[in-house]
């Protein structure tokens, strides 16, 4: 009987010891919970950023390709669309070689260095200087999509007037000389506009109003002014070939712009939601504003006016999308559409 009691006591003692060893203390459980939450947040941020990158790429092809392709004459549709398509390939190669490094490497004022050339040290580890919850490779590919669409925007200014080979040379040089330094100055660590007066006067460009739209807009204006009108215009009518293509392209641009603006929050956060809402409201108000102005001026609205207004609103709300609430966003969009 005594042996049985001894065995039972030993068994109970061992069980209690094992339970004590397997049950972590509250601090250990809290640490494990925090790690689990951080891992889930990082996974969610990464998923949203990859989705946003795909949405921004869709803005170039097929969005911008269809939008511009529908506005030119029938004989130039494929050539115009091919310009957007080829830039998806050319800019990607340049970005991998030196583009990302010149835009986001180092901390100089005007242009980056070659620390990330050939995508060296760009892997799954986050870069805390830019996005601490997603792999640097995700951030790199997201910024690549911005670099692709920016020169593609300029192509509309010289549609039907520039040879394909000349377009390739121009956009390559433009990317290296204009876009990459501007991206570094506005978004790069230590960039001139990003850290003006020691950061006391920061550059509030949430999603690319300066880097993308001002650079491409000014460059497009200079190109159009330098190259002049299309041969025969305006004596020969040059109406859009297919507004159906342009309509589909504009709709794809509208959807893709959610990745453009809300993705610039660099995570699945409340800021991304705010930018998403501001983007949509701004575009809607701009479309209505343009249509109303056109209706008043011409006596009737048009499809081209509606899609042009929506795109104008999307452009106008881009730099402010992360800073304004829905009704100010609508006001910005309305002004863009009417003006």
Which residues does each PLM region occupy?
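Hydrophobic alpha-helical transmembrane bundles of multi-pass membrane proteins
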Residues: 2-6, 10-13, 18-339
């Amino acid at each position: 009987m005594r042996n049985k009691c001894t065995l039972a006591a030993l068994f109970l003692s061992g069980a209690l010891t094992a339970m004590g060893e397997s049950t972590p203390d509250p601090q250990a459980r809290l640490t494990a919970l925090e790690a689990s939450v951080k891992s889930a947040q990082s996974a969610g941020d990464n998923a949203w950023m990859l989705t946003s990158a795909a949405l921004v790429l869709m803005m170039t092809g097929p969005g911008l390709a269809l939008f511009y392709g529908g506005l030119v004459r029938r004989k130039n549709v494929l050539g115009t669309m091919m310009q957007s398509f080829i830039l998806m390939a050319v800019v990607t190669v340049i970005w991998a070689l030196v583009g990302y490094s010149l835009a986001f490497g180092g901390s100089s004022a005007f242009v980056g260095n070659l620390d990330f050339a050939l995508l060296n040290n760009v892997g799954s580890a986050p870069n805390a200087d830019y996005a601490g919850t997603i792999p640097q490779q995700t951030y790199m590919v997201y910024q690549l999509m911005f670099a692709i669409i920016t020169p593609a925007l300029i192509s509309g200014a010289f549609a039907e007037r520039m040879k394909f080979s000349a377009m390739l040379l121009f956009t390559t040089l433009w990317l290296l000389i204009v876009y990459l330094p501007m991206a570094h100055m506005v978004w790069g660590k230590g960039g001139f506009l990003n850290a003006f007066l020691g950061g006391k006067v920061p550059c509030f460009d949430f999603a690319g109003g300066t880097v993308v739209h001002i650079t491409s807009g000014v460059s497009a204006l200079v190109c159009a002014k330098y190259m002049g009108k299309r041969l025969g215009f305006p004596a020969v009518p040059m109406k859009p070939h297919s507004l159906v293509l342009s309509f589909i392209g504009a709709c794809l641009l509208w959807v893709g712009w959610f990745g453009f603006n809300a993705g610039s929050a660099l995570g699945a956060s409340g800021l991304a939601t705010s930018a998403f809402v501001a983007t949509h409201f701004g575009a809607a108000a701009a479309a209505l504003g343009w249509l109303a102005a056109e209706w008043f001026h011409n006596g009737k609205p048009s499809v081209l006016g509606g899609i042009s207004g929506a795109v104008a609103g999307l452009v106008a709300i881009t730099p402010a999308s992360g800073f304004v609430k829905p009704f100010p966003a609508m006001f910005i969009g309305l002004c863009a559409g009417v003006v």
